[in-house]
Amino acid sequence: MKFILFALLVSAGSWYGWKQLHSQDAVSKPIRYVKIEGAFQYTNKETLKRILTPEMKRGFYHVDMDAIHQLISQLPLVAAVDVNRVWPDAVHIKITEQKPIVRWGDKAVLNKQGEVLIPDDIDEFKNLPLITGPEGQEKKLLEIMKGVYIVLKDKSMQLAEFHVNDRRAWRIKLASGLEMQLGRKAPLENMQRFLKTMDLLGEEQVAMMASVDTRYPNGYAVTWKPDTPEIDWKAIAENYKNVMKERRI
């Protein structure tokens, strides 16, 4: 069997297709056309061609639809497959891909349901937020991360990483590079306490922070970036007093 065409066809969605010459291997009516439909981001067309060619050689009447379905379903990041024989000489395949929304550890990604998926190339997803945590806690941690993401977004902050260690202590990292140690006890409250002080500190002071440790009952510890100029804490304290007076009024 010789392939004379395997090309991306322009139509609704994205289509891969190939045309085949008559095959002496096909005892019955040969398959001349295969169309594969889908909005492809991660599925490689050469991989599809390689795994489907042996089945297509079986001919129109003997090609195994279940086998094709299984072969494609086993590819990374394929969510659903629909395979149909189309008279007189074609097979149509529709592929729906998974939609990863975060990275999970070093080698996996999660979809919106919190299901673990193993892609061929994790580097394709380096721009997605990262979660690390105990195995089996993927769905729970994804839901927590969504909440943290929303809270930070309200403060014009972008969450880049969310880490939970074996002791269930939280640590997050923002797209700006700022790291926050939130601890194991009341981590959300710890984060909120820090965020409440941002308006008083001002954007310039927050931008100079390298990390914040919120695991203190009445405050937090700050590690400043190198070459941070001296901060006028007296002015900040005075500003705080004025803000509190205005709130009482």
Swiss-Prot record:
The chain crosses the membrane at residues 7-23. It is a single-pass type II membrane protein. InterPro entries: Cell_div_FtsQ/DivIB_C, FtsQ, FtsQ_C_sf, POTRA, POTRA_FtsQ_type. GO terms for cellular component: cell division site; plasma membrane. It is found in: Cell inner membrane. One of its GO terms (biological process) is FtsZ-dependent cytokinesis. Keywords: Cell cycle, Cell division, Cell inner membrane, Cell membrane, Membrane, Transmembrane, Transmembrane helix. Residues 29-98 form the POTRA domain. HAMAP family: FtsQ_subfam. This is Cell division protein FtsQ. It comes from Methylomonas methanica (strain DSM 25384 / MC09). The gene is ftsQ.
